[in-house]
Amino acid sequence: MTVMEHKKAAQLDLSQHGLSNVTEVLRNPSYDVLFEEETRPDLEGYERGVMTELGSVAVDTGIFTGRSPKDKYIVKDETTKDTLWWSDQGKNDNKAITPAVWDDLKALVTEQLSGKRLFVIDGFCGANPDTRLSVRVITEVAWQAHFVKNMFIRPTDEELESFEPDFVVMNGAKATNPNYEAQGLNSENFVAFNLTERVQIIGGTWYGGEMKKGMFAMMNYLLPLKGIASMHCSANVGKEGDVAVFFGLSGTGKTTLSTDPKRQLIGDDEHGWDDDGIFNFEGGCYAKTIRLSKEAEPDIFNAIRRDALLENVTVRNDGSIDFDDGSKTENTRVSYPIYHIDNIVKPISKAGHANKVIFLTADAFGVLPPVAKLTPEQTKYHFLSGFTAKLAGTERGITEPTPTFSAAFGAAFLTLHPTQYAEVLVKRMEAAGAEAYIVNTGWNGTGKRISIQDTRGIIDAILDGSIDNVETKNIPVFNLEVPTSLPGVDTSILDPRDTYTDPLQWDSKAEDLAQRFIKNFAQYTDNDEGKALVKAGPQLD
């Protein structure tokens, strides 16, 4: 440890977090220290990292290769009982637990971490100093500390001197809960939050994304209550300062499409929109690597080097990586500090107001067009619907594309009612004069997925404005206006009906999908605003 690292660790007393007899604290260690720690030859099982030929370390997360939403819990108390969007009020994973159950779970984690040599990473969630969360993550596993160092915003030495956490994450991945059945819980594993104590605890799952997404869920609670949009989206900015945000569930293309050599990346997954504009929550990227190639995604491929951390990829004996192998999971990932992408907004990941808002969907039915411009009413409708296909591997038990509706393109991370996010977003869009588009990165009548080249051509046309200067035609049932041609895009795919040998096939699939949209949206029709939006969705005669 350097003198500064000794100084940082010496100042830290973890007894305030319920931990006792801690043998050593490594606080915000350097990447070199983490590299030595996570590749130690004496490490076993999921603690052990292996070296790859690209210079990055690779780890396995065991059976937990994605988030475990069925094991997510939030304490129901005076703070949350009337504000939180609970699982008995809609389609979400915010299952309530009592303070007593919380105390039992927390005791399991503090017992697991006490008496150990611990890593502590202090960082920020949110690039705006006025609204950011100061987050402290405590773990006994070196690579989990590495993941957090990659993903959260790294404080300066001066900021560390006065660092006081707003939220504490205690990751006791080795701890499991033997009493889960008596407590009415799903399994021995748990990811639990207490908004009064401002603490997250993790037990049983080794998946790194639980720490990142846990803090996203907390930002999703705190920011909209202040009138700030909290969004599951990527964002980038052009040479003229024009900002675009890309909403979408995991695997729909947020990271890939926002990582564009012609534009500077603000961030790839989680953002806020306040009076100054768009700002990133994170200090890193968490990109899918399944079937990654240097030719198709050079920026992401080149980011996989020393200090990047690979998850669940297949590493051959010679250290080479088989990115095409999805035998462990389709949800293979890499985390890296955002500066591994050359073309980023510096020094702070923030920019002005967005003028293009893009909803990415992966339509497993082959019904929706590759692109359509949305009216303000359609924007609200499709934001609340959040239609996509769950893609293989981002959650346990999902291996084939499955159609789903996820409010705000991120229902798994929402902690307030979806209409609150829609209201704040639309207010921000109206104030900025932003336009919205829906872009389908999924399948069509050919049975194949729309090519990344065609999708990039569509995004280019949206961002440079050329999509606004072409002829359009109306797609029935969904009442969407689609272009008849776009530069650099295969014209034959723009009307999805043209991709079927028999157009009647599209008609029957469109009716099926429309009925699903209508059934899902019924949950929002218990007030006048929701009823008024029904006209903006699909219509069946």
UniProtKB/Swiss-Prot annotation:
Keyword Acetylation: no
CDD domains from the UniProt entry: PEPCK_ATP
Residues the entry annotates as binding Mn(2+): 213, 232, 269
GO biological process: gluconeogenesis
Catalytic activity: oxaloacetate + ATP = phosphoenolpyruvate + ADP + CO2
One Gene Ontology term of the molecular function aspect: phosphoenolpyruvate carboxykinase (ATP) activity
Main location: cytoplasm
Cofactor note: Binds 1 Mn(2+) ion per subunit.
Alphabetized Pfam families for the sequence: PEPCK_ATP
GO terms under cellular component: cytosol
Amino acids binding substrate: 67, 207, 213, 333
Localization, UniProt: Cytoplasm
Residues reported to bind ATP: 213, 232, 248-256, 297, 333, 449-450, 455
SUPFAM superfamilies: PEP carboxykinase N-terminal domain (SSF68923), PEP carboxykinase-like (SSF53795)
Annotated metabolic or biological route of this protein: Carbohydrate biosynthesis; gluconeogenesis
Region forming the signal peptide: none
InterPro entries linked: PEP_carboxykinase_ATP, PEP_carboxykinase_C, PEP_carboxykinase_N, PEPCK_ATP_CS
Keyword terms of this UniProt record: ATP-binding, Cytoplasm, Decarboxylase, Gluconeogenesis, Lyase, Manganese, Metal-binding, Nucleotide-binding
Record note on quaternary structure: Monomer.
PANTHER family: PHOSPHOENOLPYRUVATE CARBOXYKINASE (ATP) (PTHR30031:SF0), PHOSPHOENOLPYRUVATE CARBOXYKINASE ATP (PTHR30031)
Functional description taken from the UniProt entry: Involved in the gluconeogenesis. Catalyzes the conversion of oxaloacetate (OAA) to phosphoenolpyruvate (PEP) through direct phosphoryl transfer between the nucleoside triphosphate and OAA.
UniProt family annotation: Belongs to the phosphoenolpyruvate carboxykinase (ATP) family.
Protein name: Phosphoenolpyruvate carboxykinase (ATP)
Gene symbol of the encoding locus: pckA
